[in-house]
Amino acid sequence: MRYVILLRGVNVGGVTVKMAELRDLLESLGYDEVRTVLASGNALVTSESTADAVKADVEVALRARFGYPAWVQVLATDALRTIVDAYPFERGRDGWHDYVLFVLDAGVKERILALELDEAHERCADGDGVVYWTVPKGDTLDSELGKASGKAASKPHL
C-alpha cells in the first residue's frame, strides 16, 4: 500500500527535521519507495502494514530520533486523493489560500465548524476527518478560523 505521512509541527517552533534524515529514518523502519516532499514534513512510503501500524511505528521512531512529541497522520494515497477531490470551494482563486485541515479531535472539529465566519472573508466546510477552509492570502493567521486554530486547546489536534 502506498501511504502519505503528514508530520505535524515540524520545521516550526524549534522542531527541525531535515528531510534527508526523515528519509533515512523511514528507510531504516523498512519502508520502501520512500520520498520526502520539500521541507514540509510530508513523506510517501510503501508498506504492507496498516496505516495504524505505520503511524505507531513512525511516531515512536520520530520521538526517539528527534526528541519531540511527534504526531503524524497516515493515509493511503487514494484516501488523500478522495479528500482533495472533495474540496467544496473554488480552487486556485487568485489571492486566496485553499486549505485542508486534518482534525484529530472531534470536539475541536465541532468548535471550528461552529465558528461564525464572514463568508466574504473566509469559509469552512466539513469533510471526512478534515475541515476545508479558504481564506485570502495574508489573512490566514488573523482570520477567525486562523485565530481559533492557533489556540492552545486546538493546536495538538490539527
Predicted region positions:
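Surface-exposed, charge/polar-rich loops and edge strands
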Residues: 1-40, 44-158
